[in-house]
């Protein structure tokens, strides 16, 4: 069972602005699973996230850690948003 109290996969070398961008993206992913979210909002936060997390390897590591603790996949959320292209998405369980 996934705990509702989980930690976010953050890099201690990130500055406050970087942490804010990463947390915003992870929060948008949470909204996609728990409610619904505008595709543009999720993709915009993903673009900002990618300015901080440039390597695919680090992105995959963050996705794995976040999915392990929260049950939410950043990869699946972005994939769904890219396929939808506009409007809203909801990945609720």
Swiss-Prot record:
Organism whose genome encodes this protein: Streptococcus agalactiae serotype V (strain ATCC BAA-611 / 2603 V/R)
Superkingdom as given in the UniProt entry: Bacteria
SUPFAM superfamilies tied to this protein: BH2638-like (SSF158504)
Protein family according to the UniProt entry: Belongs to the UPF0223 family.
Protein name in UniProt: UPF0223 protein SAG0995
InterPro entries named in the record: BH2638-like_sf, UPF0223
One Pfam family hit: UPF0223
């Amino acid at each position: 069972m996934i705990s509702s109290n989980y930690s976010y996969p953050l890099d201690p070398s990130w500055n406050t602005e970087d942490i804010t961008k990463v947390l915003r993206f992870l929060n948008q992913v949470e909204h996609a699973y728990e409610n619904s979210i505008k595709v543009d909002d999720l993709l915009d936060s993903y673009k900002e996230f990618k300015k901080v997390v440039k390597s695919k390897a680090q992105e995959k590591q963050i996705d794995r850690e976040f999915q392990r603790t929260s049950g939410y996949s950043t990869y699946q959320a972005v994939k769904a948003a890219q396929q939808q292209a506009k409007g809203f998405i909801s990945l609720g369980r």
